[in-house]
Design a protein with these regions (language model features):
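Acidic, divalent-metal-coordinating active-site segment for phosphoryl/phosphodiester hydrolysis
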Residues: 231-244
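Active-site catalytic microenvironments for nucleophilic, acid-base chemistry
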Residues: 36, 182-186, 205, 221, ...
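Conserved beta-strand -> loop -> alpha-helix junction used to position metal-binding or nucleic-acid-contacting
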Residues: 191-203
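Residues at alpha-helix termini
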Residues: 23, 39, 58, 136-137, ...
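Conserved non-catalytic scaffold segment of RNase H-like nuclease domains
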Residues: 72-76, 82-184, 190-193, 208-226, ...
């Protein structure tokens, strides 16, 4: 059973099914999927449907219509920019690499129609100690997160907030990697299926003449205040305003 609508499976069977469907144009008979992916030769159609339904129930990218398995990737072009939601987010963590490091704070802002429409913020108990240099950088201490929810308690609320929005972050590779690592700890073999954008990459393409593309530099370029740098809520708000200006 799919744990949340905007999660996609990382299981070998499902990824093999998706690779097969991509290679044949997006759809294939259930019996062929079972034959190719599960190595069950000449399965009975009813048996093939049953096996395929198990895959479909675990991943929103797959569907079954009239014994044909279809790849149903979301069409982001079907919605105009005014209708599309963008969740601009930032994480603070116990270090630079996951694993072993963990998330200690999440800040996020929903941008719709060129304006901030909603916000999300939570400290997160990492279930491990916060290194002194991270406390010095962020101001977040072990005492501050001791009574905070663990990621497993924050995740359902954050996933609900994100919905089917496009995720945006400054250095998205880092933040998406950490976020998916934490999600994989809670929902084994799953990751976020949302499309993502990186404001570092966007600013490099749109602002080639700025000194560098660090958050503070781009914030200064657009006169966006960044008072409490290296806190997730403040960095996410500044990134959201930068994204709106870009």
């Amino acid at each position: 059973m799919l744990p949340h609508p905007n999660l996609v499976s990382e299981s070998l069977l499902i990824n093999s099914t998706i690779d097969l469907l991509i290679s044949v144009g997006g759809s294939a008979p259930a019996v062929e999927v079972v034959d190719y992916v599960m190595r069950i030769r000449d399965p009975h159609p009813d048996f093939a449907r049953m096996l395929v339904m198990d895959l479909i129930n675990r991943d929103p990218r797959l569907s079954l219509v009239d014994d044909l398995v279809h790849l149903t990737e979301p069409d982001h072009n079907a919605r105009g920019l005014e209708e599309m939601g963008f969740v601009v987010f930032d994480l603070e963590t116990t270090g630079a690499k996951a694993p072993p490091c963990r998330v200690i704070e999440i800040g996020a802002y929903l941008v719709r129609g060129g304006a901030i429409a909603a916000e999300f913020h939570s400290l997160v108990n990492p279930e491990t100690s916060i290194p002194p240099f991270i406390t010095a950088l962020t101001g977040i201490s072990d005492e501050m997160v001791a009574a905070s929810p663990v990621f497993g308690e924050v995740a359902p609320r954050f996933l609900e907030f994100v919905g089917d929005s496009v995720l945006v972050a400054h250095n998205a590779h880092f933040d998406m990697g950490f976020l998916n690592h934490e999600i994989g700890r809670i929902y084994e073999d799953y990751r976020l299926g949302n499309a993502s954008l990186c404001t570092v990459q966007l600013s490099r393409g749109l602002l080639p003449d700025v000194e560098n593309h660090k958050l503070k530099t781009i914030a200064n370029h657009f006169s966006v205040p960044l008072i409490n740098h290296h806190r997730a809520d403040e960095d996410a708000r500044a990134t959201a305003e930068i994204f709106i200006n870009l």
